[in-house]
Amino acid sequence: MKENEIGLLRGGQIKYLLSRQMNSLCKKYHLRLTDIEVLFYLKNNTEKNTASDIQKNLHINKGYVSQIVKNLIKEDYLTVTAGEKDHRYMHYTITEKTHDITDEHQRIWDLLGRKLFEGISTEDRETFDKVVNTIYENITEMLNEQPDTAHA
């Protein structure tokens, strides 16, 4: 693989850019980027809203998810309810207080997306989307082949 391909796949540059873009949002609301990502995830995944769902979809370890949701509940960004079928499962829902944060987060992502793909033709963008989807499927397949020891 070429160096720039490795860099892109490792995500370092994109993570750094995202961190810089989100820094003012984090400071404004006194939240960490991971806290905001959890709120945004829950806004967009109202049916997949347990700690296990958050852990699996955001690739955050179980203990850290527990700490995050505890703090977000304490700060009135989340509410928690026991599952109807199984009371052991806690379901998290964002509160009204969260909407400004998730709206700003979406605006930042939209701007970032526009800037990242600036100057790229529609045809090249479609090719890129196909390649990214294939890579994503390959990664998912590889992850399913190996036991998860990092998030246990």
Please name every model-derived segment.
Residues M1, T122-A152:
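C-terminal regulatory/oligomerization modules of transcriptional regulators
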Residues M1-Y29, E75-Y77:
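N-terminal leader segment of winged-helix/HTH proteins
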Residues G11, L39-L42, V132:
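Hydrophobic structural patches
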Residues G11-Q21, L58, I101-F117, I135-Q146:
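Alpha-helical linker/hinge and terminal dimerization helices associated
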Residues I14, T34-D35, T50, K97, ...:
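N-terminal positioning helix adjacent to the helix-turn-helix/winged-helix DNA-binding module
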Residues R20-Y64:
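N-terminal helix-turn-helix DNA-binding core of bacterial DNA-binding proteins
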Residues A51, V69-K70:
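Short, hydrophobic-biased segments on the C-terminal half of alpha helices
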Residues K70-K130:
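Charged, amphipathic alpha-helical coiled-coil/dimerization segments
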